[in-house]
């Protein structure tokens, strides 16, 4: 078996996770989103999370909710970079931001395997990031 893992990404960081949520940094913007896989305890305190967060997603149902702005100066749309790619980040009512950072290893794999003279049609790319 070959293990693939993500290298450091300057504009994204999973800062902490636990108690059913994850604290993420997208460029200079911090978000809290529910995550049922975060069933363990956080490393950082609740106060540390609150001092960092710009937006928190509050679920209304299992399929929708709303973002609550915790920092009045934060903008609800911004950009981040990965390599030469620039991604537009926007808060959605489905708790997503338009990009799935866990796909980074797939982007690297595709970039390493597909040469410039090849054309790629990604029929399964929810955000389109793998097609960039």
Language-model segments: what does each one mean?
Residues 1-6:
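N-terminal accessory targeting/assembly segments
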Residues 8-25, 31-101, 108:
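Non-catalytic substrate-recognition/targeting regions of SAM-dependent transferases
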Residues 26-29, 107, 125, 132:
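Functionally constrained cores in energy, signaling, and assembly domains
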Residues 101-117:
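Conserved alpha-helix/loop element of class I SAM-dependent methyltransferases that forms part
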Residues 112-132:
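Conserved SAM/SAH cofactor-binding pocket of Class I
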């Amino acid at each position: 078996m070959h293990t693939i893992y993500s290298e450091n990404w300057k504009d994204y960081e999973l800062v902490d996770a636990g108690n059913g949520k994850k604290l993420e940094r997208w460029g200079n913007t911090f978000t809290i989103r529910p995550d049922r896989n975060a069933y363990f305890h956080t490393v950082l305190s609740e106060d540390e999370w609150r001092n960092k967060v710009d937006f928190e997603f509050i679920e209304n149902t299992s399929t929708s909710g709303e973002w609550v702005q915790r920092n009045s100066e934060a903008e609800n749309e911004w950009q981040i970079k990965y390599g030469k790619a620039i991604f537009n980040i926007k808060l959605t009512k489905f708790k997503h931001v338009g990009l799935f950072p866990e796909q980074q290893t797939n982007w690297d794999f595709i970039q390493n395997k597909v040469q410039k003279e090849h054309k790629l049609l990604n029929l399964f790319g929810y955000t389109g990031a793998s097609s960039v």
